[in-house]
């Protein structure tokens, strides 16, 4: 768990009667940046963003929630809708509770990046989004075969270490990252929340769901988007950022030479890239 600093504090509040943990910091009147964590086993706001948030909070108002089912938030999920939909609604309900009504900049890694893109694809939320930055989060498509390697988890630290090796480049903070991620993975309810949507349904009860139109709803959306693709990432198909850039007229694609989570292993370099994009986007919007 992230140790509280003078810049970043940890809070838990009720949102729609569901415990919701989030990290926050920076000036109260700063431009709001919402950081969205990855969806791997043991994912949480501090696991994904602990080294980036203090850098961002020097200038921006930062808010980093734990998604439902993850971290210190309620282990409450919906299995009748997509894994994105109910978490997007919960995220904006949290912002409402915090009095954040102006458009926010969404910054996500992996599943968190996909949440940002899926929110942008939804006309109900598009007006509340000033920009989206996604680091190796595609919104769902373009998965590579290695994605299957991080799905199974037997509850052991050794298995989580194998998953972490796929997600992250080697770094001095690897043991601390493993400790934090394993701590959240062991919280009661997390395993069930992760496994629940994948439970087999008897043939007699199976209902064919409508085809997913994504990414077509993003076609022509002019909101600024930063697509960060990593050349060492084996979980996604190479070139996914160019494919999305072809759909989004105001998207910028950048490459980094790392694995799936450079925000964890190379926080300063990652933040410099994101911060530069945010500065240009904010200045361009004035």
Question: Residues of each region from the PLM?
Answer:
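Flexible "cap/lid" loop of the alpha/beta hydrolase fold
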Residues: 117-122, 126-162
């Amino acid at each position: 768990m992230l140790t509280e600093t003078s810049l970043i504090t940890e809070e838990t509040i009720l949102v729609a009667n569901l415990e919701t943990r989030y990290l926050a910091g920076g000036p109260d009147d700063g431009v709001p940046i919402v950081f969205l964590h990855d969806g791997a086993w043991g994912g949480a706001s501090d696991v994904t963003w602990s080294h980036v948030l203090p850098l961002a909070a020097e200038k921006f108002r930062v808010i980093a929630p734990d998604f439902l089912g993850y971290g210190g938030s309620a282990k409450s999920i919906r299995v009748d809708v997509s894994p994105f939909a109910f978490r997007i609604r919960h995220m904006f309900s949290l912002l409402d509770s915090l009095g954040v009504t102006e458009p926010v900049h969404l910054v996500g890694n992996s599943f968190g990046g996909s949440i940002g893109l899926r929110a942008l694809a939804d006309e109900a939320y598009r007006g509340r989004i000033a920009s989206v930055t996604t680091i190796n989060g595609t919104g769902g498509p373009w998965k590579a075969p290695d994605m299957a390697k991080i799905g199974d988890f037997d509850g052991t630290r050794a298995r989580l270490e194998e998953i972490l090796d796929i997600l992250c480049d080697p770094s001095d903070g690897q043991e601390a990252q493993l400790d934090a991620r394993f701590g959240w993975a062991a919280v009661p309810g997390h395993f069930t929340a992760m496994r629940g949507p994948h439970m087999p349904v008897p043939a007699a009860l199976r209902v064919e769901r409508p085809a997913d139109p994504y990414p077509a709803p993003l076609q022509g959306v002019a909101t600024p988007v930063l697509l960060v693709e990593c050349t060492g990432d084996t979980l996604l198909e190479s070139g996914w950022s160019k494919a999305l850039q072809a759909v989004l007229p105001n998207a910028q694609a950048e490459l980094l030479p790392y694995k799936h989570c450079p925000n964890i292993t190379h926080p300063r370099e990652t933040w410099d890239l994101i911060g530069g994009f945010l500065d240009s986007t904010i200045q361009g919007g004035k």
